[in-house]
Amino acid sequence: MAAQLAGALRPPRIELFFKTPAELKERLRDLTAAGYRSFNLVNKDKKDPMLAWVDVCCEELGPGDDVCAHFSSKYNARGGPALAERLAALAARSQASGVALSTLLVSGSGKRKKGHFASDLAGALNAPPSPVGVAFNPYEDDMEKERAALAAKLKGGGVSSVWLQFGVRLEDLDRELLWLRASFPSLELVGSVFLPTKKLIAQQKFRPWNGVALSDEYLSGPEAAERVTRQLLAVYAKHDVRPLVEAPGVRTAKDLAVVSRLFGEPAPPAKKRRL
């Protein structure tokens, strides 16, 4: 069963967790040595030096690798102009390095300030110089509102991917994926996955994250959480959704072993490329 599921899934993306540029380099070297080629950089603070992190990735990676740099409208107060500048900068770096660079536009957690809505970014999303994705939560109480918000983001035609919030209400997920595939068949879909570890479960029991829909079964322990995670991945495979491995992060060999157990071993990495 596990082998069949791994074979049906697309190779996972890995969200990068680090505190310093040196640690970022170490993560990239360990993960590429293990065969992983696609990564995400998270924007959690207005002081995040995102383009400097992208430069580190471009130094360590090469053609065939790709990096998605998140852009939080909460932490980038100039809205559309700031996003347009980011997209142009990524396009230039991608051309110079051969690394495929893209952006995931998110609103950020907590209450949004005036001007921090996707509609204010419409100009930058109309014809972006580098690929842009937007977020979608298939577990919202008001899905009509969530669908309408997504349709507004996609109206300009410049968005190429939709990124799904993590959760385990699988009937809701299946329903929304059916709608997404019927309504926007050309879009790439990426779905979040949490690693079912003791650390993650303890974290979510103590202080659950806003908008994350987890069940009592999932929170009952690592074995149950892994079982539910495999059911989630089966839904992703059914709808050709690419997984994104998020919390609590792939930081150690033990974390990497959990990823391999869920997804199988990645393709052998090519020899190291230096540009």
Task: Name every feature range the model reports, one short phrase each.
Residues 141-143, 170-175, 197-202:
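Short acidic/glycine-rich loop or secondary-structure boundary segments that cap or lie
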Residues 173-180, 252-274:
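C-terminal helical cap(s) of enzyme catalytic domains, especially alpha/beta-barrels
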Residues 133-135, 161-165, 189-194:
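Short, conserved beta-strand edge motifs with alternating hydrophobic and charged residues
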Residues 168, 193-199, 249-251:
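Glycine-rich beta-alpha junction loops
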Residues 188-241:
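Catalytic-face loop-and-helix region of soluble metabolic enzyme cores
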Residues 2-148, 156-159, 216-230, 237-242, ...:
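Active-site beta->alpha loop and helix N-cap motifs at the rims of alpha/beta catalytic domains
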Residues 86-88, 180-181, 206-210, 262:
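Short, hinge-like loop/turn segments at secondary-structure boundaries
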